[in-house]
Amino acid sequence: MSINDDISSDVMRIRDADWNKRSGSKVPSPGDVTLSNGAVEIDATYLYADMANSSRMAKELDRRVTAKILKSFLASSSRLISHFGGTIMSFDGDRVMGAFMGDAKNSSAIKCSFSIAYSVTQLIRPKFESKYDTVKNAGFKIRHATGVDTGTVFVVRGGIYGSNELISIGRAPNLAAKLSDLREGEYTTFATKSVYDRTNKLQKQRLDGSSDIWEKRDWDFCDENITIYRSSYWRKPGSN
């Protein structure tokens, strides 16, 4: 068969297939979902962490230094997602996506986001600025943003045999990714009202009990005005 026959066959086969869908109580692994027509529907909270200024890093810094910064960000973010009970779903260049399930999924995702903010602002940025003058004197600061949303997600496998991965389809992963693109001053965590309302009290206040860590605002998404909450707060892992 020619390549045109192959892709035409793929499109028709996928279009005409009936989904073999089931509800999931945990985040599926690729082996849990058949490539042909498998799907798992889950209720999950998605976290999307994105390193800012990566294009400027690539332009202004030695590529070996840029690679170290990005690797540090992805390593620490991935470790924190796993630490707080999440599952790493995918990487996309300078971004990582995690999914959290269970009764505490929203609080766990927010705790994770606060700890990612700690790793960037209190570890990665100062440690690289202290070692490399080019980073310290660059026309930008090492920074990031994390978006968090929750909802029902349709998980399928995309790609071809031998080269495929899970794809998360739904508002939660899409909106979390869009929120991670926001660059608003020192704010690092952006969460939807759905997440904020279901997050426990400890993630709405500082360790000393003061409750000024979140700011409510409206945001336009796909022609819809939605309520989001943003925070510049960070918390060292293990503090609470």
Curated annotation (Swiss-Prot):
Cross-referenced Gene3D superfamilies: Nucleotide cyclase
GO molecular function annotations of the record: lyase activity; metal ion binding; nucleotide binding
Keywords recorded for this protein, A-Z: Antiviral defense, Cytoplasm, Lyase, Manganese, Metal-binding, Nucleotide-binding
Coiled coil: none
Superkingdom of the organism of origin: Bacteria
GO biological process: defense response to virus
EC number: 4.6.1.26
One GO cellular component term: cytoplasm
Cofactor(s) recorded in Swiss-Prot or TrEMBL: Mn(2+)
Chief location of this protein within or outside the cell: cytoplasm
Catalytic activity: UTP = 3',5'-cyclic UMP + diphosphate
Compartment(s) of residence: Cytoplasm
Residues annotated to bind Mn(2+) 2: D50, D94
Matches recorded under SUPFAM superfamilies: Nucleotide cyclase
Binding site for a ribonucleoside 5'-triphosphate: Y48, R95
Record carries keyword Zinc-finger: no
InterPro entries with a match to the protein in the record: Nucleotide_cyclase
Annotated positions binding Mn(2+) 1: D50, D94
Keyword Manganese on entry: yes
Domain Guanylate cyclase: 45-180
Role description: Pycsar (pyrimidine cyclase system for antiphage resistance) provides immunity against bacteriophage. The pyrimidine cyclase (PycC) synthesizes cyclic nucleotides in response to infection; these serve as specific second messenger signals. The signals activate the adjacent effector, leading to bacterial cell death and abortive phage infection. A clade B Pycsar system. The pyrimidine cyclase gene of a two-gene Pycsar system, weakly generates cyclic UMP (cUMP) from UTP, has little to no activity on ATP, CTP or GTP. Expression of this and adjacent effector RsmPycTM (AC A0A1V0HUU2) probably confers resistance to bacteriophage. The genes are probably only expressed in response to bacteriophage infection.
Family the UniProt entry places it in: Belongs to the adenylyl cyclase class-4/guanylyl cyclase family. Pyrimidine cyclase subfamily.
Protein name as catalogued: Uridylate cyclase
